[in-house]
Amino acid sequence: MSDYTIAAVDDVPDVLGDYPGEMRMFTGSIGAEQVAFTYRRMPAQTGGKGGYGHAHRTQEEIYFVISGTLQFKLGDDVVDVGPKTAVRIAPPTVRSVWNEGPDDAELVICSVRLEDQVDEHEMHEGFWPQ
């Protein structure tokens, strides 16, 4: 018997609450044991600019922009990333993502799945001033 799971975006809870856009963490919903997989929709003028950034202790991430153009602040660099483009970010690199607009942007974030996320994340308040 084959072992697989299928889930549509609307099958996975949006963890952003009242914050504009969507962030849907598929990992648990599909029972992924090794891969962390997150879908995010970012309306114009949303993201981490004017706020925080984050880094990881051990977890490498790959961000894949599906549609729109996003600004990534990666350490001291700010780069524009368009559709159908992947960005690999090493664990200690502080990062944040911003959608300047005018349209919504969609992206997927992939990494290795970790059981203990609490000690993995390092928040950096004021990382990307406006």
Label for each model-derived stretch:
Residues 1-37, 43-44, 52, 120-130:
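A short, N-terminal "cap"/entry segment at the start of jelly-roll beta-barrel domains
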Residues 27-28, 49-57, 98-100:
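Short histidine-centered beta-strand/loop micro-motifs
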Residues 31-33, 73-77:
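Short strand-coil-strand connectors
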Residues 40-43, 55-72:
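Short, conserved beta-strand element in jelly-roll/cupin
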Residues 62, 69-71, 78, 94, ...:
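Structural motif
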Residues 72-73, 89, 95-101:
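Short beta-strand His + acidic residue motifs that chelate non-heme Fe in jelly-roll/DSBH
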Residues 76-91:
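Short acidic-glycine-tyrosine-enriched beta hairpin
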Residues 98-130:
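Double-stranded beta-helix
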